[in-house]
Amino acid sequence: MLAGALFLTACSHNSSLPPFTASGFAEDQGAVRIWRKDSGDNVHLLAVFSPWRSGDTTTREYRWQGDNLTLININVYSKPPVNIRARFDDRGDLSFMQRESDGEKQQLSNDQIDLYRYRADQIRQISDALRQGRVVLRQGRWHAMEQTVTTCEGQTIKPDLDSQAIAHIERRQSRSSVDVSVAWLEASEGSQLLLVANSDFCRWQPNEKTF
């Protein structure tokens, strides 16, 4: 897997990193896309999990001040949807926590909080490695005739994807009445198709000014 292999070489590409980055990786259960903004000691990160088959789309938003996690905001788009929110003070102590689903609010246990903090640290470490390794997420609308993509930034490009990835996109496109959205990763080691879907990825993609 391209993203996994890049962890081995991430540290050699750590100069002049941009403040706003998009990256991602594939795991067993689905694709994870990550948007991140670094401003001084502050880090704002959004991770979007899209399942391959079963499961629910999930967004996880985190904020750090230095090494201290200050916010966890998780939305699980199940039926009914679930929101999990926790805030921490500048010493790292918990100041607010809540789980809400179908109008019912519940407190979180200490074990649950510890698990969410662990997952936050885990995704931060993965994001650090992908960012330093310059693994870049690109996404946009596929144009089957030209095999090009109009990215969410408005550029029309031809992704450097292998024939297997192109064939997968074309199969999905043949079953859709609209141009499918595609997401892929680019790095010095090559490109990897990450996700294909009917939904419009650009409609909700974060941008640097408002993130």
Predicted regions span which residues?
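Flexible glycine-rich surface loops and low-complexity tracts that mediate binding to linear polymers
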Residues: R172-Q192
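C-terminal motif of bacterial Sec signal peptides marking the signal peptidase cleavage site
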Residues: F7-A10
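Beta-strand/loop nucleic-acid-binding surfaces
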Residues: Q155-Q173
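Post-signal-peptide N-terminal segment of Sec-exported extracytoplasmic proteins
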Residues: V32-R63
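OB-fold/S1-family single-stranded nucleic acid-binding modules
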Residues: A187-F211
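Bacterial signal peptide processing site
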Residues: S12-N14
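Surface-exposed, polar helix/loop patches in the mature regions of secreted/periplasmic/lumenal proteins
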Residues: S78-Q132
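Structural detector for short beta-strands of small beta-barrel domains
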Residues: D128-T150
